Curated annotation (Swiss-Prot):
CDD domains: Hint, HNHc. SUPFAM superfamilies: Hedgehog/intein (Hint) domain. It catalyses: DNA(n) + a 2'-deoxyribonucleoside 5'-triphosphate = DNA(n+1) + diphosphate; Exonucleolytic cleavage in the 3'- to 5'-direction to yield nucleoside 5'-phosphates. It comes from the Archaea. Disulfide bonds: none annotated. This protein undergoes a protein self splicing that involves a post-translational excision of the intervening region (intein) followed by peptide ligation. Pfam families: Intein_splicing, PolC_DP2_cat, PolC_DP2_central, PolC_DP2_N. This is DNA polymerase II large subunit. Residues 1399-1415 have a biased composition (Basic and acidic residues). Heterodimer of a large subunit and a small subunit. NCBIfam families: intein_Nterm, polC, PRK04023.1, PRK14714.1, PRK14715.1. It comes from Pyrococcus horikoshii (strain ATCC 700860 / DSM 12428 / JCM 9974 / NBRC 100139 / OT-3). The keyword Nuclease applies. The keyword Nucleotidyltransferase applies.
Length: 1431
C-alpha cells in the first residue's frame, strides 16, 4: 500500500525521532548505572500479526486470498464452497466428502483461521435420510465438545455454512419429528442443570422454534455420561447428552441470533426469516410462541381507520422499541440522573459525528453542561440508555442547547454558553435538555435499531437543495462552497442575497434564515418549515393546542407584518389570566416568551413560529382522534411541519473526568527500600539525618576489581561495573554473578536455589550523601522511598534519580516511569487556536493544509489530525514540563550527556514524543504532542485510543472465589454481575463495589500456597480479534487474549510471560484439589481461536495478582489503572523489568513493548464502525422513520471499515458537526468540587427537581436502594470482620494484641473500620426518606439499619457507646414509637409514607424521655487506647 508523500514523511519523521531517543537511551544505559545495559522497551510495528491456518484442500490458499480481496471474507467463504463442490480442487469422491471439506474450509475462512472450530469442533459431516418422514436426504453436522472453545459466533456460522452446502448439493431440509424436538428440549435443560450452566439458557419454546426451522440436523457424539428420558430416537445414535450439539443450538444459533442475522443478510442466504423475527421479538421483550400455538376462534377483520402519519409512527415506535431502563436501575449518590428512559425533554437524539465525538462519545451543547449545575464537564462519563452503555461528553456548539423556564415564568432558548452563565441562577425548570449528537457508527457497533430522526438543520438543507434541483433544475451541494454561477441562478429564483445563500449552504448549522424567509422558502419550494422555527408541537396534546388556539383567537393582541405578500406575526401579547392552563402548553412547545407584569409576550421571530403553523389563526384548530398535533396542522395548513421531538435518550452521570499525575499510594520519588527507618512517610532523608540503619531485603553488588559492596551498579571507588551478589537462603553464603552462573544459580553446599537478594542492613546516610555529591542536589525537604521492594530481584533505583525527581517535584510509578493519567476523548480535526499552537509551528510539524485542501494560513482553519498526534490537557503539559526538566537533569547530572528537551514552558514540548498506555493492556503506542487544551481530557485520534490493547479472559472462564464464606466456582461473567457501580473508561467497563461478601483465591508464588484476597475491581472489555487457547497435559485448558500475562514455572522460579510468548512444553501450575499442593503441568497444545463473545472479562486481585481458573489452573489476572502518557525518553531511560512487582500481573500495565507505526486494521475493531462523512444523506433520515437496522444502511454512510487496506484509511476523514471550541465548557464536574455525600446528594436532587424529564422521587428511591443501603449494610458487615492496624508500621492483625500495642514496633493499634465509617451515609439516607416520596419498605430498611448499628455498638462496646437523646422529629424514632405504642397518634406512619412529615413536631412522653436521659448519663465515651488499657 503506497501512502501519499505527506503521510509517508509523517511516519518517517516519527521513526527518526524514536530512533533519536533510542540512541540517547542506549548511550546512557551503556554506562552501566541501571539494572540492564540495554534499553528494555523493544519496538514493534506489529505485536503478534494475524494468524491464518486454513484447512485444505491442497491449493486452496491462493484462491482464498484472491476471493477475499475481491469480495470480503463472507462472500469468499461461499465462493470457496461453490468451487470445492464444483470439483475445482480435485475429485473428493462422495457427496459427504465434498460436504465435509466445504464446511470445514468455509468455516476456517469465516473465523479467520480458527483451527479448533473447523477441525476439532466438528467431529464429522454426514448425509442422512428423513426415514420417519419422506425418506429425503438431508445434511447432518456432528459436533464435539471442543466446539465450545470456538465461541458462539463460530458455532452459529457453522450451521449457516452447513445450510449453504446443503443447498449447493441439492439436499432437502432436516424434518424433525416431535420426538427429535422434545429430545433436544430435554437435553438443553438437563445439560444446564447437571453439567454446566449455559451462557444462554433458552426456553423450551425457543428450542422448539429453532428445531422446527433450522434446515440441517445439529447433532453430535455423547460428551457426558448423563442419560436422557427421550431414548432411541431414529437417527440419534446415543441416549446420552450431546454437549457439542447443545452448545451450538443454545450458545450459538439462539444466543448469537442477532449477530447471525448480520451474516445471513451479508451472505444472502435465504430461509432464515424466522430468526429475524425471533431477534425482533426478543428486542421488544415479547414471549416466543410457536406458529399456530395460540388458538383463535374469531376471524380478524381489518378496519380502515383515519390515522395521522405521526400518530401511526409513534405507535409503531412504541411497539417496536421499548424504553431501556437498565442504566437507571443504579444511581450513585451525587451523580445525577439527567433523563428517565426515552422521556420527552431528555437528551434529543441528533444523528452525526462532530470532530470531537463518535466512538462512544456524545457531543452536547456546553450550555447544557452549565445548566445541569456543571455536573457535566468536558470528559465526564455518562451511563446511557442507547446506543451503547456508556459515553464520554464533549462540547459541540452547533447543536441545540436547553430550553428553560425562569423563575419569573419566562421561557428562554439557551444555545449560547455566555447566556447560560448569565441566567443559570434564574432557572426554575429545564423543559428540554438539548441535543446529544450521536454517531451512526455507534448504532452499527451496538447493532441498535435506528430511532426516528428528529428534524434538524442538516436534514432541512438536504430537502432544500433537493427541491431546488427538482423545481428549478439548479444543482447545489450542502456543506461546501458552490460555484458562483449556480449560486447566482438559485439566488435569482429564490429572491435572496447571493452571499447569504452561499453561507447557508456552506454552514447551515450556524446560518439560520430569518423566519419570514424560512416561510418564503417553504411556500415556493414546498419543503417543511425550517427546524429552528419548528416548535415541539407533538409534545402538546391536540386538546391543549385547541384550547391555546381559542385563547389566541379571542384574547391575543397580535402585531402583523408582511414579507413579499407573506403575512406573519411579529409580536403577540396575551393576558396571563386568560392563558391559565394554556401557559403550560406554551412552555411544552418550547416557545421562547417573556412574562411582563400581567402579560405574556411572544416577540420576533417566535410569534411567527407559533402562528404560521396555525395558519395565522385563519382556520380553526380542532383535536382529532388518532392524530397528533402535527398531523392536524399538516392536514389543514399550507406550510407543513416535521416533528423535531420524536426520539429522546436517557442518561445518568458516570465517573467524573480525570487528568492527574499518576502516584503510587503513598507517593514515591525513588524505588529504594527504607523499611521502618524512614518512619510512616518512608523519608530517606529523615532516616539519613537521624543516622538510622535500615534492615531491608535488597540486592547488593560487588566490585570485581576493588571488592566494594553496595546497591550501586557502578563502583564509587574505581568506576567498574559491579556484579550482582547471589545469596543462599539456607546458609547465607554469597556468590558473585560470575561464580553463581557457574553453579547454575544453585548453592554448591546446600543444593538450594540462590536468590538475588537478602535481608541486609544499610546506612541511608552514607548512600544519600554519596548520591547528593554525585548530582549536586542538596536542598530537598524529603526523599520518599518505599517500605520494601516488591520485585523478584529487589534491585533498587539509584538514589540520584530520586533526588532529581524530588528537585523537580515529580513521582515515580512501580516500573520506574513517570506518568500522567487522563480520560480519553476522540478528536479527528482541530483549529490551531484551540490547542495554543501557531500556524508556523504546525507547518513545521507537517500540517500544511486544512481539511478541505486549502493552504494553512489562519489559526481558525480546521485541520485534520494525524493518527499518532495527541492534544493533552494543560494540567498534563505542566506536569510533563517538570518531567522533561527531570530527564534533562538526569542526562546532564547522572549520565553526563547533553540535555535533550531544554523546555522552559509547556509549549516547548510540542513535537516531542510520548508513550500512550491504557489499563489492562500490554503494548504502548508512540504519540506526538501537538498542543494543549484547557480541559481535563486527553484528546487523541480514535485510532490512537483504539490501539491501546486489552488483556482478559472469555466470560465463561470459571474462577475460584469465596462468597459469604463458602468456596465456589463462578464464571467471570457471573462474577462481573456480583459487583455494582459500573462505569465506562477507556473502552472498558469497570465495577468496584461488591454486592456480596466476596474474596478470590490467589496463589502466593513465593510460598507456593493458596491464599484468600480481596477483589479490587472487575473488568469487562471489548473482545480482541483472537484468543489463545492453552491445552495442558492433564486435559485441562484455558483461553486468554494474546498479550495476557501467564504465570510459567521456568528454571526453578515463577516467571511471567505474555500469552503469545508461551511455548508448548512450558510448565504451568495446577492446584491439587485434595492436598492444595501445586502441581507442575506442561502445555500440550496452543492454538488461536475467535472470542466466544463480544466481551472478555478479568479482575484485579489485591495481593498476589494471580487467580485460579477452570480446573485449578494458576495464572495471572490482568491489571492496570487509568490511560496514561509518559515522555518517551523518560520511559527508555528509567523503565526496567527488574523493578516490576514479582507477584503482579501489573507487568501488563507497563510499556513492555511499544508500537511505533499505527495500523488502523489492527486496532480495536470498534473504531472501524466510525462514520467519516461530511453529512448523512437524505436517504438515511427517511430510513430512520422505518425503524431500520443500521446494517441496512452501512453502504449509504461511509465508515472507516470501508477504507481499510487503502491509503485513505489514514486521511480524508470528515465530520458532520463543527464546534466553536473543543475546550468550551466546565473544566471540572461539580461532583469533584462538593464535600460530603449529603451535600452531593442534595445538589443531585436539586438538578433532578429542575429537569422535566426526571422524577426526583424515583431518583431518591433508587439512590437509597442501589447505593446508600447496600453501603450501610456492607460497612456494618465489614465492621464485624475487620482487621486491626498499627499506626506506625501498618502491620495488620486479625485479632488485636491484648495490651493494645504492636509487638513489632510498639505502635498504637487502631480499628480499620470505625463507627463513623459505618454510619457516614445514614444521615443522607434519613434525609431522603424524610423529604421524598419513597416506599414504606425503603423507609423501614433505613430505620432497621440504624437500629442494627446502634444495637451492634451497644453490644460490642457498651461503655463506649454514647446514647443520643431521643429526637421526636427523627423519622426512624417516630416509626418505632408508632410501632411500640409510644405515639398514640394514628396514621402517623402513613403520613410519613406520603411525605407529610415536614415541620411536624411531637413531644416524647415525659416518663420515657426521663428514662432515656438517665440511661445516657450512665454511659461514657472512651478512646480505643483507654479501652485496650482497661484492667
Amino acid at each position: 500500500m503506497e501512502l501519499p508523500k505527506e503521510m509517508e514523511e509523517y511516519f518517517s519523521m516519527l521513526q527518526r525521532e524514536i530512533d533519536k531517543a533510542y540512541e540517547i537511551a542506549k548511550k546512557a544505559r551503556a554506562q552501566g548505572k541501571d539494572p540492564s545495559l540495554d534499553v528494555e522497551i523493544p519496538q514493534a510495528s506489529d505485536m503478534a500479526g494475524r494468524v491464518e491456518s486454513l484447512v485444505g484442500p491442497p491449493g486452496v490458499a491462493e484462491r482464498i486470498r484472491e476471493l477475499v480481496k475481491e469480495y470480503g471474507k463472507e462472500i469468499a467463504a461461499l465462493k470457496i464452497v461453490d468451487e470445492i463442490i464444483d470439483g475445482k480442487f480435485g475429485d473428493l469422491g462422495s457427496k459427504e466428502k465434498y460436504a465435509e471439506q466445504a464446511v470445514r474450509t468455509a468455516l476456517a475462512i469465516l473465523t479467520e483461521g480458527v483451527v479448533s472450530a473447523p477441525i476439532e469442533g466438528i467431529a464429522s459431516v454426514k448425509i442422512k435420510r428423513n426415514t420417519w418422514s419422506d425418506n429425503s436426504e438431508y445434511l447432518a453436522l456432528y459436533y464435539a465438545g471442543p466446539i465450545r472453545s470456538s465461541g458462539g459466533t463460530a458455532q452459529a456460522l457453522s450451521v449457516l455454512v452447513g445450510d449453504y452446502v446443503r443447498r449447493k448439493l441439492g439436499l432437502d431440509r432436516f424434518k424433525p419429528s416431535e420426538k427429535h424436538i422434545e429430545r433436544m428440549v430435554e437435553e438443553v435443560d438437563l445439560y444446564h442443570r447437571t453439567v454446566s450452566r449455559l451462557q444462554y439458557h433458552p426456553s423450551p419454546e425457543e428450542v422448539r422454534l429453532a428445531m422446527r426451522n433450522i434446515p440441517i440436523e445439529i447433532t453430535g457424539e455423547a460428551t457426558d455420561e448423563v442419560e436422557v428420558s427421550h431414548r432411541d430416537i431414529p437417527g440419534v445414535e446415543t441416549n446420552q447428552l450431546r454437549g457439542g450439539a447443545i452448545l451450538v443450538l443454545a450458545e450459538g444459533v439462539l444466543q448469537k441470533a442477532k449477530k447471525l442475522v448480520k451474516y445471513i443478510d451479508k451472505m444472502g442466504i435465504e430461509g432464515w426469516e424466522w430468526l429475524k423475527e425471533f431477534v425482533e421479538a426478543k428486542e421488544k421483550g415479547e414471549e416466543i410462541e410457536e406458529e399456530g400455538s395460540a388458538e383463535s376462534t374469531v376471524e380478524e377483520t381489518k378496519v380502515e381507520v383515519d390515522m395521522g402519519f405521526y400518530y401511526s409512527l409513534y405507535q409503531k415506535f412504541k411497539s417496536e422499541i421499548a424504553p431501556n431502563d437498565k442504566y437507571a436501575k443504579e444511581i450513585i449518590g451525587g451523580r445525577p440522573l439527567f433523563s428517565d428512559p426515552s422521556r420527552n425533554g431528555g437528551f434529543r437524539l441528533r444523528y452525526g459525528r462532530s470532530r470531537v465525538s463518535g466512538f462512544a462519545t456524545w457531543g452536547i451543547n456546553p450550555a447544557t453542561m452549565i445548566l445541569v449545575d456543571e455536573f457535566l464537564a468536558i470528559g465526564t462519563q455518562l451511563k446511557t440508555e442507547r446506543p451503547g452503555k456508556g459515553a464520554v461528553v464533549t462540547p459541540v456548539t452547533t447543536i441545540e442547547g436547553p430550553i428553560v423556564k425562569l423563575k419569573d415564568g419566562s421561557v428562554v432558548k439557551v444555545d449560547d454558553y455566555k447566556l447560560a452563565l448569565k441566567i443559570r441562577d434564574e432557572v426554575e425548570e429545564i423543559l428540554y435538555l438539548g441535543d446529544a449528537v450521536i454517531a451512526f457508527g455507534d448504532f452499527v457497533e451496538n447493532n441498535q435499531t435506528l430511532l426516528p430522526a428528529n428534524y434538524c438543520e442538516e436534514w432541512w438543507i438536504l430537502e432544500f437543495t433537493k427541491a431546488l434541483n427538482e423545481i428549478y433544475e439548479v444543482e447545489l451541494k450542502p456543506f461546501e462552497v458552490n460555484s458562483s454561477e449556480d449560486l447566482e441562478e438559485a439566488a435569482d429564483y429564490l429572491e435572496v442575497d447571493i452571499e447569504f445563500l452561499k453561507e447557508l449552504l456552506k454552514d447551515p448549522l450556524r446560518t439560520k434564515p430569518p423566519v419570514e424567509l424560512a416561510i418564503h422558502f417553504s411556500e415556493i419550494l414546498g419543503i417543511p418549515l425550517h427546524p429552528y422555527y419548528t416548535l415541539y408541537w407533538n409534545s402538546v396534546k391536540p386538546e391543549q393546542v385547541e384550547k391555546l388556539w381559542r385563547v389566541l383567537k379571542e384574547h391575543a393582541h397580535i402585531d402583523w407584518d408582511n414579507f413579499r405578500g407573506i403575512k406573519f406575526a411579529r409580536r403577540i401579547v396575551i393576558p396571563l389570566e386568560k392563558l391559565r392552563d394554556s401557559k403550560r402548553a406554551l412552555e411544552l412547545l418550547g416557545l421562547p416568551h417573556k412574562v411582563e407584569g400581567k402579560n405574556v409576550i411572544v416577540d420576533y421571530p417566535w410569534a411567527a413560529a407559533l402562528l404560521t403553523p396555525l395558519g395565522n389563526l385563519e382556520w380553526e384548530f380542532r383535536a382529532k382522534p388518532l392524530h397528533t398535533t402535527i398531523d392536524i396542522i399538516n392536514e389543514n395548513n399550507e406550510i407543513k411541519l416535521r416533528d423535531r421531538g420524536i426520539s429522546w435518550i436517557g442518561a445518568r452521570m458516570g465517573r467524573p473526568e480525570k487528568a492527574k499525575e499518576r502516584k503510587m499510594k503513598p507517593p514515591v520519588q525513588v524505588l529504594f527500600p527504607i523499611g521502618l527507618a524512614g518512619g510512616s512517610s518512608r523519608d530517606i532523608k529523615k532516616a539519613a539525618e537521624e543516622g538510622k540503619v535500615a534492615e531491608v531485603e535488597i540486592a547488593l553488588f560487588k566490585c570485581p576489581k576493588c571488592g566494594h559492596v553496595g546497591p550501586e551498579h557502578i563502583c564509587p571507588n574505581c568506576g567498574t561495573r559491579k556484579e550482582l551478589i547471589w545469596v543462599c537462603p539456607r546458609c547465607n553464603a554469597e556468590y558473585p554473578e560470575s561464580q553463581a552462573s557457574g553453579y547454575n544459580y544453585t548453592c554448591p553446599k546446600c543444593n538450594v536455589k540462590l536468590k538475588p537478594y537478602a535481608k541486609r542492613k544499610i546506612k541511608p546516610s552514607e548512600l544519600l550523601k554519596r548520591a547528593m555529591d554525585n548530582v549536586k542536589v542538596y536542598g530537598i525537604d524529603k526523599l520518599k522511598g518505599v517500605m520494601g521492594m516488591t520485585s523478584g530481584w529487589k534491585m533498587p533505583e539509584p538514589l540520584e534519580k530520586g533526588l532529581l525527581r524530588a528537585k523537580n517535584d515529580v513521582y515515580v510509578f512501580k516500573d520506574g516511569t513517570i506518568r500522567f493519567d487522563a480520560t480519553d476523548a476522540p478528536i479527528t480535526h482541530f483549529r490551531p487556536r484551540e490547542i495554543g499552537v501557531s500556524v508556523e509551528k504546525l507547518r513545521e510539524l507537517g500540517y500544511t493544509h486544512d481539511f478541505e485542501g486549502n493552504p494553512l494560513v489562519s489559526e481558525d482553519q480546521i485541520v485534520e489530525l494525524k493518527p499518532q498526534d495527541i492534544i493533552l490537557s494543560k494540567e498534563a503539559g505542566k506536569y510533563l514540563l517538570k518531567v522533561a526538566k527531570f530527564v534533562d537533569d538526569l542526562l546532564e547530572k547522572f549520565y553526563g550527556l547533553p540535555r535533550f528537551y531544554n523546555a522552559e514552558k509547556m509549549e516547548d514540548l510540542i513535537g516531542h514524543l510520548v508513550i500512550g498506555l491504557a489499563p489492562h493492556t500490554s503494548a504502548g503506542i508512540v504519540g506526538r504532542i501537538i498542543g494543549f487544551v484547557d480541559a481535563l481530557v486527553g484528546y487523541a485520534h480514535p485510532y490512537f485510543h483504539a490501539a491501546k490493547r486489552r488483556n482478559c479472559f472469555p466470560g465463561d472462564t470459571r474462577i475460584l472465589v469465596q462468597i459469604n464464606g463458602t468456596p465456589q466456582r463462578v464464571t467471570l461473567k457471573e462474577l462481573y454481575e456480583l459487583f455494582d457501580e459500573e462505569h465506562y473508561e477507556s473502552m472498558v467497563y469497570v465495577r468496584k463495589k461488591p454486592k456480596v461478601d466476596i474474596k478470590v483465591y490467589s496463589f502466593n508464588p513465593e510460598e507456593g500456597k493458596v491464599v484468600l484476597t480481596d477483589i479490587e475491581e472487575v473488568i469487562k472489555a471489548p473482545a480482541t480479534d483472537h484468543l489463545i487457547r492453552f491445552e495442558l497435559e492433564l486435559g485441562s485448558s484455558f483461553e486468554t487474549t494474546v498479550d495476557h500475562p501467564v504465570l510459567v514455572y521456568e528454571n526453578g522460579k515463577f516467571v511471567e510471560k505474555r500469552a503469545f510468548e508461551v511455548r508448548e512444553g512450558n510448565i504451568i501450575i495446577i492446584i491439587d484439589e485434595s492436598t492444595l499442593e501445586p502441581l507442575k503441568v506442561a502445555v500440550k497444545k496452543i492454538e488461536f481461536i475467535e472470542p466466544p463473545e463480544d466481551f472478555v472479562f478479568s479482575l484485579n486481585a489485591k495481593k498476589y495478582h494471580t487467580v485460579i481458573i477452570n480446573e485449578n489452573i494458576v495464572t495471572h489476572q490482568c491489571d492496570g489503572d487509568e490511560d496514561a502518557v509518559m515522555l518517551l525518553l523518560d520511559a527508555l531511560l528509567n523503565f526496567s523489568r527488574y523493578y516490576l512487582p514479582e507477584k503482579r500481573g501489573g507487568k501488563m500495565d507497563a510499556p513492555l513493548v511499544i508500537t511505533t507505526r499505527l495500523d488502523p486494521r489492527e486496532v480495536d475493531s470498534e473504531v472501524h464502525n466510525m462514520d467519516i462523512v461530511r453529512y448523512y444523506p437524505l436517504e438515511f433520515y427517511e430510513a430512520t422513520y422505518e425503524l431500520k437496522s443500521p446494517k441496512e444502511l452501512v453502504g449509504v454512510i461511509e465508515r472507516v471499515e470501508d477504507r481499510l487496506g487503502k491509503p485513505e484509511m489514514y486521511y480524508g476523514l470528515k465530520f458532520t458537526h463543527d464546534t466553536d471550541d473543543i475546550a468550551l465548557g466546565p473544566k471540572m464536574s461539580l461532583y469533584k468540587q462538593l464535600g460530603d455525600m449529603e451535600e452531593k446528594v442534595k445538589r443531585q436532587l436539586d438538578v433532578a427537581r429542575r429537569i422535566r424529564a426526571v422524577d426526583e422521587h424515583k431518583v431518591a428511591e433508587t439512590i437509597l436502594n442501589s447505593h446508600l443501603i447496600p453501603d450501610l449494610r456492607g460497612n456494618l458487615r465489614s465492621f464485624t470482620r475487620q482487621e486491626f492496624r498499627c499506626v506506625k508500621c501498618n502491620t495488620k492483625f486479625r485479632r488485636p494484641p491484648l495490651d493494645g500495642k504492636c509487638p513489632i514496633c510498639g505502635g498504637k493499634i487502631v480499628l480499620t473500620v470505625s463507627k463513623g465509617a459505618i454510619e457516614k451515609y445514614l444521615g443522607t439516607a434519613k434525609m431522603l426518606v424524610t423529604e421524598y416520596k419513597v416506599k414504606n419498605y425503603t423507609r423501614q430498611r433505613i430505620c432497621l439499619t440504624e437500629r442494627d448499628i446502634d444495637s451492634l455498638f451497644e453490644t460490642v462496646f457498651p461503655e463506649t457507646q454514647l446514647t443520643l437523646l431521643v429526637n421526636p422529629n427523627d423519622i426512624c424514632q417516630r416509626i418505632i414509637m408508632e410501632r411500640t405504642g409510644g405515639s398514640k397518634k394514628s396514621g402517623l406512619l402513613e403520613n410519613f409514607a406520603n411525605g407529610y412529615n415536614k415541620g411536624k413536631k411531637e413531644e416524647m412522653p415525659k416518663k420515657q424521655r426521663k428514662k432515656e436521659q438517665e440511661k445516657s448519663k450512665k454511659r461514657k465515651v472512651i478512646s480505643l487506647d483507654d479501652f485496650f488499657s482497661r484492667k
